[in-house]
């Protein structure tokens, strides 16, 4: 399970001026409610990842996973508040604006200064999740395909160690293997097969925790 060790943290990817500008953009924009991650889906993915799989098995699992997501979407209108979270899509959706595209380009440029990246055109989707005190995020796996990668920007202008908001990474037995504090300008890049979850900010933060995510 070498992929569980593939977690890289980069600090000061954005300077304070840039991160403040990004935060101001994110904090004044509109967010929509989306369905939170499904615990059963996580358990199915973990079971699949425990064994070595063929390419055919991988593609079949991805197909079944997508079909389940589509079935779940039909029932989304009946979800209670604790099963929802706030998100904004910046790339890959009709509602994206020119400002969203400028944000994506700026974040990509900053990241390119600290690590090797695929071409910008290979960037799949970009979105920001807003996590508030009392929200109930659940652990999940982004993608079981070994060719994928998740990059997470911490986009609050200010954050204190006592405010919570960490990203927690787990092994396949639910043991915590790493916790990453959401310091402004920090980026964590990881194999999307690693189970992880966000921690909500504690009451003393008085602000939501923002993360902007790129999927490659």
Give the ranges of each region predicted by the language model:
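Non-heme Fe(II)/2-oxoglutarate
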Residues: 1-117
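Catalytic core of non-heme Fe(II) oxygenases with the double-stranded beta-helix
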Residues: 108, 112-216
